[in-house]
Structures are given as C-alpha cells and as structure tokens.
C-alpha cells in the first residue's frame, strides 16, 4: 500500500541542528498511540468530576475503569500489530499496552517501517543529541489507526525552570520576620505569607505528594537533612521516598547539578509535613544495549514525560499520589501537536483518578524565541507546555512581600494549541476586555490562558551539594502551591471526603476567595536574542503582561491562602 504522512515538521525546533545520519544499528524504542474510543465523553466526564455542584463532583474513577474507557477497539490493535509482524518486527520486541503499542527496532528497520530517514540532531543549549526525523509515514490502510509514533518528530527540550542560582554566605539561623522575606525566602516566610502556620497533616496512607524528577537530577538525603536542621528544626524527622521509573537513578554521590531536585524536595516536603512525599525519578531509558555508535542511548531516545505518565496511570489506586508537582516545561510550538494532545489527555486521566497535577508556568515571561516555527517567521509570544494544557494547574511567580508583585520572568499567556476551557471564560474575558488591542496579533485570544495561580518564585534558600544557594524560578512556586493543596487534601480525607483531583473548575469557581490578588509588577520577554545561544530571535519592544485586578497572565488568580482554601474545600 502507498504511504501517507502522519506528521511533518518544516524545520527542527529552535536550537536543534541536524547532523549526520543515524547509525543503522542504533536501537530505538517507539511508542505508537492508537485512537481511543469515547474521547468526547471522556472530556465531559473529566469536567463533571471536577465541577463543584455536579452530582459526579470528586467521584474519582478507579484505574481499571479508566483503562476500560480508553481501550481502543480490539480490531484496531490487531490490525496495527499485524502490520508490525508482517514487517518483520520480532514478537518479543512488541508490547501491547492497550492504548499504546511499544516496539523496539534498529534505525534501519524503523526507516523502512516509517518511510523516512533518521538523523542525529544536536541541541546547542544543552549539548544533548537525539536521533529524530522531521517527518514519518505509515501505509495508507492503517493511517487512520495511528495517532502518533514517537520518538520521531518530538525533540525533547525539557528544561528545569530554575533561573538564578547564587551561592550564599553562611546564613544565620533565626526566627524570620516577614520583612526579611523581601531578601530571602525560607519555609517560615511561606508559612506566614500563605497562612499555613504550623499546620501538621494527619499521617494518612491515602495522601501522598509526588515530586517529578527528570534529567538525572538527584534528590540528596544529606542536603535535605542539613536544610531541615537550619530552616525547619521542628521537622527534622521529615522524609521522602524515591521511586525509580524506567531505570531512573537517585545517585547520592553524583557531582551533577541537582538544584532543581533539592529545591522541590526542600519546600514540598517541609510545607506538607507528615504527608508522604515521593520523588519519582524518571530516566526515560529504553531497553537498549549501548554500542560504539550510540554509547549512551539514554540521552538519545528518551521520552520522559510519557514514561512517567504511563507509569502513574498504571499504579494501583492506593499508590497514586493525590498531588503531583513538576517544574519543567518547553516552548509549546516545539512539540508535535499529536504529542501535546496525547500527554494533555494523560494529565486529564490523572485528574479523573483524583490527582491534582501542578506545573510551574515557565521562566520566560512573554517568551524568548518569539517567532513562529511554521516557516512564516511571524513574531509572536511563546506559550509554554505543559503549563498550557487545560487539565493541569499552572503556577506563575511572585516576589517581595507586603505587597507581593509579579516576578518579571513568570511565564504566562495563551495557548496556540488548546482552546480556552469554559471554567476560565469569565475570568479571562474580563482581562481581555481591559487589555483591548494591546499586543493584538501576538497571542491567540481564544486559547487556554495560563498561569492559573502563583506563589513566591525568587530568592529561595536551598541546600545543594553541601552548599547554601539562593534559587529563583517558577520551579519554586509549583512545589509551594502543591504542598498547600496536599494540606487541603489531608483535611478533606480526615473529614471523610475525597481529595480535590483536577483543581481548575473549583479554583476559578471560588471567584477570588482563598487568594490574594496580585496587582503589582508584570512580566518581560522577547528580547530579540536567545540568551543561551546568542542567536537572533523575535523582538517585541517592551513586551510584557501586567499583573492587574482579577486574573492575569503573570500571576493567574493570585497567591494562595491556606486557611481560606481549606474552609472553602470543606464547604464552610
């Protein structure tokens, strides 16, 4: 049968350079997504479960109920499996996982299967190399049965959202007044600012805060213990467990940078004290044997967020976290559309199972690249994914106290891929009315707007590799907000009620209750060059989103007040 293109990129995403052809013997593990049944019903069901007042509100689904809902028709799986077998893919290299089929083949076979050529691409910013292609096809008779096959056109530019890391002189161990929090942020600052006080969650096996680790970032126990001794001396018995996904390591002696992991653990665990904390370390490694041509396959063909999402969706109900916080993201346009859709669907399924999925919004303000990659070179603002997925809660950044103001690097804006969900219509329309024609044409005014909320994101004191450092980035705000939600869940479970799950319809429905509206400051961006490569990029003079009354694309609905949110959740 003739081939039909599944996906095509006009050029590699920003920062990636095409190099030599991939070695024919290099093994790649592919994941093929099949069309799911019931996709429209699923969307409605997810919203019903998350909408206060609906009869299904917080009636979360079990793992096996979700699996049954998303399983493709048997005839579909059978036809795709038959194609792989006919093309000579060995049976023991094929794994049928319901919604996905995984298969591992050398590049030479993959090129025949997908009618394409694979090349090595080099990322100028990170030095990473990946085997990818700019387009791939499948035979016409199965084209409608294949949603996507990855890794092909997805260039993983995962970046942790850490901006500034500054070594600190020895820090005094004092009780901190709120005034000191203008200079540095510690757990005490956040406990005062967000009205958490000395709250201690009841120990409950059903409540778990999950922290995502990627890119060989390791959470070190020694650093964590020293952090507790200095900044949470009443909580020195706090702890976390490590769960390895797909061969992820948690190397206690690594000399690699691990500021991201330290930041997430230090604050998520200290602020949700007594809730079980789990660090999920994901390597995204295929079952590959290194050879000369590809000495470290892990760098080349990893798909860490799909690996992590699939692992979590496969967990038994009693092992699932009730909150998952993740501090990384990438330019939305650098992802193949089908990949963004699929991972966003997986976040939605986690929400339906009762997980509050929380992401940092990004550290690029209105954007860095600020130029369309579809060949048009049109100047535009850059939305960040996964923050732009309507099924995650995206957290922007603030700085300073009395009053808090938007931090200039806090990413926000409007998705070019996902339409604006109804739950945020009212809040976002009111902002767009105030904005008028300002920045018209640089953003998609009908897109999903983000962030949803905000929290402190600069000058955090962190212990990393035996040193005190000050860290900034929306990486810091996501675990803080997640810890507050974990505490709300602890109180709900104690009262015999289910946890919050997907948060956004509830958060927007509070109409400002439980939040401090941030009205000072704004973001910046689109400087005209990419800082880490020096290459030219889209330039928008004075590019900015302002923090204003009500929702805005820098601080969302504002910063959380735990004492009010817990009352609202309990219906008081």
Can you annotate each of these PLM segments?
Residues 95-97:
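Short, glycine-/polar-rich solvent-exposed loops and beta-turns at beta-strand/coil boundaries
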Residues 390, 394-430:
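Polar, glycine-rich mid-to-C-terminal structural blocks
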Residues 473:
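Active-site core of glycosidic bond-cleaving carbohydrate-active enzymes
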Residues 237-239, 278-279, 358-359, 394-397, ...:
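Acidic/polar loop patches that form or flank catalytic/metal-binding clefts of enzymes
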Residues 17, 440, 489-553:
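An often Trp-containing, charged/polar helix-loop segment at the C-terminal end
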